[in-house]
From Swiss-Prot:
Cofactor note: Binds 1 zinc ion.
Start and end residues, zinc fingers (unnamed): 3-34
Every ATP-cone domain range: 49-139
Pfam families found in the cross-reference section: ATP-cone, Zn_ribbon_NrdR
NCBIfam families: transcriptional regulator NrdR (TIGR00244)
Function, as annotated: Negatively regulates transcription of bacterial ribonucleotide reductase nrd genes and operons by binding to NrdR-boxes.
UniProt protein name: Transcriptional repressor NrdR
Originating species: Burkholderia cenocepacia (strain HI2424)
Amino acid sequence: MRCPFCRHDDTQVVDSRVSEDGAAIRRRRRCSACDKRFTTYERVELNLPAVVKKDGSRTEFDRRKIVASMQLALRKRPVAADAIDAAVARIEYQLLATGEREVRSEKLGELVMNELRGLDTIAYVRFASVYRRFEDVSEFADVIEEFRRASPAKTPRKR
């Protein structure tokens, strides 16, 4: 594999591990020319459905867009990168399981929101506010109230 730093063609695998979700192999590589190290991921190439946008146009499913949108919602939140990768892998699996050749962008957005809900409630609210185009504070309050009803009441701990 070509080194991303010096473009030399000769690199060696220093370490190889299966990712947490088992969907990828993480490899640490070292360039024999510049001695720098870098990480690569090996994944199965899947034939995911095309995404049909709101305007009717179609585009290829892009894992990087899903990861980027989740990372933006999770910015400065205590969620590991492996957890994001696992969530995206679950979304891909759900899309493959449908057997459909196309998926509407609205459905894809709902899948992302469901995964964020399980990862971090703040990120879920952030994503939902953009995805659902919240107009005022009451819409935030509605989502927060939805969480309160869904989760059991927590009693404050005595100190």
